[in-house]
């Protein structure tokens, strides 16, 4: 019988965690790697995309190294993790904004205004009362107008990792359907983002 394995990678705020499972759901190995962050002042929480991506690669390597020769039997990978955040990238998948999760509250005045003006629309169209991505994008474009000119796509952290790992064209950037409501840019009935 063929030895089929699957790897899952959790893109957490503090740690990247990976697990490899067999077809019976048994965990064969697990690995973790810390994620660096910067907290220069209250309400400011920065995680640089390249640092996050480096942690992902190191964690995956720990997992495959622990598997030894069985690493060749990993048939698929799945990514899960942080949902309430935002990252904008340029046309080459370079981080423009850093990963800005809900701990980074610099966007709050923009979120408050958007919710005051569009709360019903967000709930009825996007299915959310916490539209993180659109308020964070408005904040970033307002506070960093020059940097924002480089933005090609806005993604969740899993989309960033998938894009960089797969070296896909930026036009093929994706978002997991389970995360779409957090964006504030989604029409959940039409499954459009």
Protein language model regions, located:
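N-terminal glycine/serine-rich phosphate-binding loop of ATP-dependent small-molecule kinases
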Residues: 1-98, 108, 113, 150
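A generic structural signal for ordered alpha-helices
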Residues: 2-3, 30, 34, 118-119, ...
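Gly/Ser/Thr-rich active-site cleft segment
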Residues: 11-13, 121-193
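Carbohydrate-associated surface elements
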Residues: 104
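Glycine-rich phosphate-binding segment of PLP-dependent enzymes
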Residues: 111-117, 192-193
